[in-house]
UniProtKB/Swiss-Prot annotation:
Catalytic activity: alpha-D-xylose = alpha-D-xylulofuranose
Protein name: Xylose isomerase
Organismal lineage: Bacteria, Bacillati, Bacillota, Bacilli, Lactobacillales
Residues that, per the record, bind Mg(2+) 2: E266, H269, D305, D307
Subcellular location: Cytoplasm
EC number: 5.3.1.5
């Protein structure tokens, strides 16, 4: 069955494209800074928002028109995989991501769930072998089921901790089976609702123990992915332990996990944490921990995770600048952790939304590459910190000064003269790269 029979394969047609099923900016084979655009961006489609959402919200029923529902949960699961790989083929997307519960019915027991995962990953592997599509990352959903009401690896219940371990073990087995390039941990329930009954230090110690078990098991099965922690400050838990990039890195460093873990950063999660997306990427870059991106955007007027498809060229440009400055995102990628709006309920909206996101990041990549070629930010930063490139500043950087010598220097000064940052002018110059 063709699920999108009225949608052609999406091709690059340029800014004057007449078809809505065309890329106007994403040209996969276009060479930018020495390699094809597709290799810079490494686009991935998220199974969960694409295939399992129905458009419902707390105030209304689902609106999405979908044609893959079967007569049994397993039939529906296989239909979804068929439709999903058709979407990947239409878009020319080379990667995908999923949670375990996205692809397999959970059944009535852990045993049945794990068996269903085996069946469905066999089915998915067949599709991968046929199409050449690759798994960017998979993860275990340990936040939806009532079992995880108090967390998974930070739970107060040792039985629940064991259930989480079993689910992640299967996730690692699956990732090896499908040759996943990364494995993600997002702790939606790893945090606390009320500090009055929480031993935070104990919970974080247990979380670190869990991650060490993950490292040990991966070595045992000779599987070496890039492990990624995905920060988010809140939602669904009031206070989540992986609040933002800096908090996650503090945890990683405290427990000596730097050799195994980097960060998967999401734009909307940055918004919820009170940061820009580029801030989070810059923090991760400075720790050498920029692992992968969830390319979406939030609504600055709302206080929750709206997971919109990215259309903000300004944010995409600054994000891609950080990626280029880091030397690239591989083995990570840009995963569209985004869902179509409730009013975008037609089947082809799934294709159109991904086209919009892919075009947006293609424009961001082009602009960021031009800025790198022009040394735009490099010159600005060099000028701002030039006092540390000679004289007393250079002496400070070379660790040749101390408090006493700097005091003597300060006393010899006849006042201090600061330079204007000209920030409005710099923003105006940045805008010139975006048109």
């Amino acid at each position: 069955m063709d699920y999108f029979e009225n949608v052609p394969k999406v091709q690059y047609e340029g800014k004057n494209a007449k078809s809505k099923y065309a890329f106007r900016h994403y040209n996969p084979e276009e060479i930018i800074m020495g390699k094809p655009m597709k290799d810079h961006l490494r686009f991935s489609v998220a199974f969960w928002h694409t295939m399992t959402e129905d458009g419902s919200d707390p105030f209304g029923d689902g609106t999405y028109q979908r044609n893959w529902e079967g007569s049994t949960p397993m039939e529906t699961a296989k239909n979804r995989v068929d439709a999903f790989f058709e979407i990947l083929e239409k878009l020319g997307a080379e990667y995908f991501c999923f949670h375990d519960v996205d692809i397999a019915p959970q059944g009535d027991s852990l045993k049945e769930f794990l068996e269903n995962i085996d069946v469905m990953t066999d089915y998915i592997k067949g599709k991968m072998d046929k199409t050449g599509v690759k798994l960017l990352w998979n993860t275990a959903n340990m936040f939806t089921h009532p079992t995880f009401v108090n967390g998974a690896a930070t739970t107060n219940n040792a039985d629940v901790y064991s259930m989480a371990a079993a689910q992640v073990k299967k996730g690692l087995d699956v990732s090896k089976k499908l040759n996943g390039e990364n494995y993600v941990f997002w702790g939606g329930r790893e945090g606390y609702e009320n500090l009055l009954n929480t031993d935070m230090n104990f919970e974080l110690d247990n979380l670190a123990r869990f991650y060490q078990m993950v490292i040990d098991y991966a070595q045992k099965i000779d599987y070496h992915p890039q492990f990624l922690i995905e920060p988010k400050p809140k939602e669904p838990t009031k206070h989540q332990y992986d609040y933002d990039a800096a908090t996650a890195m503090a945890f990683i460093q405290k427990y000596n996990l730097e050799d195994s873990f980097k960060l998967n950063l999401e734009a909307n999660h940055a918004t919820l944490a009170g940061h820009t997306f580029e801030h989070e990427l810059n923090v991760a870059k400075n720790y050498n921990a920029l692992g992968s991106l969830d390319a979406n955007q939030g609504d600055l007027l709302l206080g929750w995770d709206t997971d919109e498809f990215p259309t903000d060229i300004y944010t995409a440009t600054l994000a891609m600048y950080e990626v280029l400055d880091f030397g690239g995102i591989a083995p990570g990628g840009l995963n569209f952790d985004a869902k179509v709006r409730r009013t975008s309920f037609a089947m082809d909206d799934l294709i159109l939304a991904h086209i919009a996101g892919m075009d947006t990041y293609a424009r961001g990549l082009r602009a960021a590459a031009k800025m790198k070629d022009d040394n735009f930010f490099e010159q600005i930063i060099a000028n701002r910190y030039e006092s540390f490139s000679s004289g007393i500043g250079k002496q400070i950087v070379e660790n040749k000064e101390d408090l006493e010598s700097l005091t003597n220097y300060a006393l010899s000064l006849n006042g201090v003269e600061n330079k204007s940052g000209h920030i409005e002018h710099l923003k105006s110059l940045l805008n010139d790269y975006l048109v």
